[in-house]
């Protein structure tokens, strides 16, 4: 049985960072914005924080996940995590989260120059983090950071990365073009 294609909206407004330069939400503001996004605007998913950033972020995530669990939205609350074996997963669990968006390197340039690792070494580290997350019942989506440059520079790197993740229990592989490198014609 085929399912119809569906566009799923994920809002990242609450994840303080480059997408919200100069903006920082208090824990109460974060929870209020999350309520509006999920209750009123009916956004499918929201990424509300980066793991391990601060106590303020922890407080904001705890407040938001507590509300979300009471209202049946907990599976729609997502937190950016890192390839750090257990540290991000433990932080997310402590904050009451159940979904991690794992930031991985989507270009050979980032993998070799930022991590100083080969793709195989990076995949080994990713699998270690994924295994720990799954053992703790955390659902994981994966971001391929800089994939658009990676695809333009060395498409096989991106294909090999996706192939290396396809049997690892990843719910979604996300391909954000945060730098605006690709045009719609190039990705559709």
Where are these regions (language model features)?
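Alpha/beta enzyme core
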Residues: 4-9, 15-45, 66-72, 85-141, ...
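Short catalytic-loop micro-motif centered on adjacent basic/acidic residues
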Residues: 45-50, 76-79, 175
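N-terminal active-site wall of soluble small-molecule enzyme domains
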Residues: 52-80, 84-89
């Amino acid at each position: 049985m085929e399912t119809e294609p569906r566009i799923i909206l994920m809002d990242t407004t609450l994840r303080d960072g480059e997408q919200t330069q100069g903006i920082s939400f208090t824990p109460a503001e974060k929870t209020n914005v999350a309520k509006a996004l999920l209750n009123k605007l009916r956004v499918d998913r929201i990424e509300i924080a980066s793991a391990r950033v601060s106590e303020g972020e922890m407080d904001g995530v705890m407040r938001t996940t507590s509300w979300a669990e009471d209202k049946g939205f907990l599976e729609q609350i997502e937190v950016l995590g890192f390839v750090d074996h257990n540290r991000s997963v433990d932080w997310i669990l402590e904050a009451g989260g159940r979904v991690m968006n794992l930031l991985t390197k989507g270009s050979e340039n980032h993998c070799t120059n930022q991590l100083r690792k080969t793709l195989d070494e990076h995949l080994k580290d990713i699998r270690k983090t994924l295994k720990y997350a799954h053992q703790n019942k955390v659902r994981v989506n994966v971001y391929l950071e800089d994939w658009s440059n990676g695809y333009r520079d060395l498409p096989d790197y991106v294909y090999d990365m996706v192939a290396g993740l396809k049997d690892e229990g990843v719910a979604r592989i996300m391909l954000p073009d945060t730098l605006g490198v690709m045009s719609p014609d190039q990705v559709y």
